[in-house]
C-alpha cells in the first residue's frame, strides 16, 4: 500500500500539482529511445496520463532524437514523431515551448498506463486492453494521412476483397538474446502453426509475413512455394541470422553503406508491417510490441489470434 501511495505522489500527485502553472506536457525519451513500437508504447502511456491530468500532450523527438531520427529534415520535418504521426495534442512542439507553460514528462515508461488489462509476457493485449486503448489511439496517435493512404494502396495491390489473410509476425535479432525480452520460438514452430491454421480455415488464400530476418523470409518462401496460398511481404531492410545472440535489434544494426534516409525508412517499414498485420483476418505472432500494437489497431476484429510461446 505504501509503495502504491509513493508511486502516486511521484506521478499523479507531482504532475497534477504542476498543472496549476503548466498547460503542455512534453513527452520525451532522453536515452534515444529503443525500437519503434517501444517508443510508441512509451508515448501512449504518457498521453493517457496527460489527458487524465488535463494537459495538452506534445511529443518531442526533435530535441530528444531517437534511433529513427535523421540528421537533416525529412520532408521539412525535424521532429521524428511527426515523420510518421500527427500531433498527439492540439499544439505543435514549437507552440508548447514558446508558451513557457510546459512541463517535461518523467523520463521513464508509465507501465500502469501502457499495460492496462494486459496479460502474461510482454504486455500481451486482451480484448479489454483493446477496448481501453483503441479510442485513445484513434483520437491521439494517428498516422499521417499521406502515409496511411500509401499503405492502403500497397495493401490493395496485394489483397482483393474475397481474400482471407493470415498475418504472421516473426521477430528475431535482439529478441533472441534473453536480455529482458521473451525468447521467440523457432521458425519451424511458426511454419507448423501456420500450416495448421491454413488447413483449418479454407478462406485463407493469402499469407502476409512480417519479419526482420532473411533466414525466416527464405524458410517461409521455401515452405509455401507451390501451395494453395500466396505468400507476400513488404519490401524492408532485413539481416541474416548468423547464430550469434545479438544484443542490439535491427534498428541498431550498423550498416556499411546505408541507403539515403535509412533510419527514417527503418521506422516507416516497421510501421507498414504493423499496419498490414492489423488489416489481416487472422494473426499468428510471438511476444513483441509490433504484434501488440497491431492487435490494438485491429480493434478486436481478428477472427483468431494465436501467440507462439517462445523457449524458456
Could you describe each region identified by the protein language model?
Residues 205-302, 306:
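Donor-binding and catalytic core of enzymes assembling or modifying cell-surface/extracellular glycoconjugates
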Residues 52, 191-194, 232-236, 308-311:
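Glycine-rich loops and low-complexity Gly/Arg-rich segments
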Residues 3-206, 217:
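Secretory-pathway glycan-assembly enzymes, especially type II membrane glycosyltransferases
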Residues 171, 212, 309-310:
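Cofactor-binding loop segments of dinucleotide-utilizing enzymes, especially the Rossmann-like FAD-
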Residues 1-2, 269:
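Short, intrinsically disordered terminal tails adjacent to the first/last structured region
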Residues 51-63, 285-286, 297-312:
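Gly/Pro- and small hydrophobic-enriched strand-loop and loop-to-helix capping segments
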Amino acid at each position: 500500500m505504501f509503495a502504491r501511495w509513493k508511486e502516486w505522489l511521484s506521478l499523479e500527485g507531482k504532475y497534477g500539482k504542476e498543472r496549476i502553472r503548466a498547460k503542455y506536457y512534453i513527452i520525451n525519451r532522453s536515452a534515444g529511445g529503443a525500437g519503434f513500437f517501444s517508443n510508441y508504447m512509451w508515448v501512449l502511456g504518457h498521453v493517457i496520463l496527460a489527458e487524465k491530468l488535463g494537459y495538452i500532450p506534445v511529443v518531442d523527438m526533435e530535441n530528444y532524437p531517437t534511433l529513427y531520427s535523421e540528421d537533416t529534415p525529412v520532408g521539412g520535418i525535424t521532429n521524428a514523431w511527426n515523420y510518421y504521426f500527427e500531433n498527439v495534442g492540439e499544439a505543435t512542439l514549437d507552440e508548447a515551448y514558446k508558451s513557457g507553460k510546459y512541463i517535461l514528462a518523467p523520463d521513464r515508461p508509465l507501465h500502469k498506463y501502457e499495460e492496462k488489462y494486459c496479460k502474461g509476457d510482454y504486455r500481451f493485449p486482451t480484448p479489454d486492453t483493446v477496448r481501453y486503448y483503441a479510442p485513445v489511439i484513434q483520437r491521439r496517435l494517428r498516422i499521417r494521412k499521406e502515409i496511411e493512404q500509401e499503405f492502403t494502396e500497397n495493401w490493395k495491390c496485394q489483397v482483393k476483397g474475397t481474400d482471407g489473410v493470415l498475418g504472421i509476425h516473426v521477430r528475431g535479432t535482439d529478441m533472441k538474446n534473453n536480455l529482458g525480452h521473451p525468447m521467440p520460438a523457432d521458425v519451424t514452430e511458426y511454419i507448423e502453426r501456420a500450416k495448421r491454421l491454413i488447413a483449418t480455415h479454407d478462406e485463407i488464400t493469402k499469407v502476409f509475413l512480417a519479419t526482420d530476418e532473411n533466414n525466416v523470409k527464405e524458410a517461409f518462401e521455401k515452405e509455401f512455394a507451390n501451395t494453395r496460398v500466396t505468400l507476400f511481404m513488404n519490401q524492408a531492410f532485413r539481416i541474416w541470422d548468423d547464430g550469434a545472440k545479438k544484443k542490439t535489434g535491427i534498428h541498431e544494426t550498423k550498416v556499411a553503406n546505408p541507403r539515403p534516409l535509412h533510419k527514417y525508412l527503418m521506422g516507416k517499414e516497421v510501421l507498414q508491417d504493423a499496419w498490414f498485420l492489423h488489416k489481416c483476418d487472422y494473426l499468428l505472432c510471438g511476444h513483441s510490441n509490433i504484434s501488440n500494437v497491431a492487435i490494438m489497431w485491429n480493434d478486436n476484429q481478428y477472427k483468431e489470434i494465436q501467440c507462439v510461446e517462445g523457449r524458456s
